[in-house]
């Protein structure tokens, strides 16, 4: 089936996560075109929040250029599997999975809700869609390396991406689906 068909057939799940000092409930659900503006804003905030020890301000600006607008994310919502962690009408995080390639294209959490189980819940929501006996790949930022290692991903190699005259570094990581 097409990614849109997969999204419609996937049930919405409710997850308990720790938010600050209290326990709150958030839902994992498919993204809709109406979510695009909030996704763009969360993406922008998450990238700009990454520590300067990982990426400079100019690298972060190059990273978000062209992707911090609703139109960009509306196109992606239509062609891939994007899941959101949402609490009421607020998006706490999102993940984009490309099932045809068994590739996690992105995973971002609102800086206010990082280290609170949102990213783990999002990853758990899409990994069961991975083909059995295949490898799931992800190209992750330096800031995300510890999270993915903790989830069982193995570092494969460093990538160098040319963007706006800069070289951005990220890392190819893999996860064997038989270990899920």
Predicted regions and their residues:
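Conserved G/P- and acidic residue-centered "switch" motifs that form tight phosphate/ATP-binding loops
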Residues: 117
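Conserved active-site tyrosine of GNAT-family acetyltransferases
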Residues: 148, 153
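C-terminal "cap" of GNAT-fold acetyltransferases
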Residues: 138-145, 157-180
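Conserved N-terminal entry element of GNAT/NAT acetyltransferase domains
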Residues: 11-34, 176-180
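Conserved hydrophobic beta-strand within the GNAT/NAT acetyltransferase core sheet
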Residues: 104, 135-140
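Residue-level detector of beta-propeller blades
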Residues: 91, 155-157
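Acetyl-CoA-dependent GNAT
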Residues: 30-33, 41-112, 123-125, 129, ...
